[in-house]
Amino acid sequence: MSAALESEAWDGDWYIRGISATGAKLGSDSLDEGKIYLEPNVWAAISQTVPEERAIGAMDSVQRRLSTEHGVALCAPAHTKEVPGVGLSLLVFPVGHKENGGIFCHANSWTIVAEGILGRGDRAYQYYRSYLPARYNDSAEVHQVEPYVYCQFTHGPESPR
C-alpha cells in the first residue's frame, strides 16, 4: 500500500484523491479545479502508511490551501465543470456547498486526529476551535443554528452565501 501511494498518489505537495475512469488524476496541482482534497491527506497521516515527512508536507498543504476561519474545506478550488471520466457527481452541489468545497464537521475531526498523530497539538487545537459552535456565540448568523449544535457543514469560502 505504501509503495502504491508513493508512486501513484503523491502529487509533489499532497496526495491526490483518485484516478478517473479515463486515467485523469483528481486532486492534482495540475488541474484548474479540485486541485487538493482534504480526505486523502488526512487519511495518509492517520493511517501512517506514508513517510512521516510526506504526511507533514501534505498536512501543511491542507493548512495553506483548505484551512479557513470556520474550519477546513473538503476541496479547493471547487468544481464548476464536469471532470472527464467522473461525470457530473462532483457538480451535485453548488460551489462551496457540501462536498464541493464545503466545510464538514466530521472531516474536520479527521484533520484534528491527523495533526495529533503528527505531534502537532497546537495546530489540532486551532482546527478544533475554528469550527467549535460556542466560538460563534457573537455571530450566530454564520451557522444559523443554536450555539450548542454542530452543523453537518458550513458553506466554504467559495460559496456565494
Predicted regions and their residues:
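Acidic, mature catalytic/reactive cores of soluble proteins
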Residues: 1-161
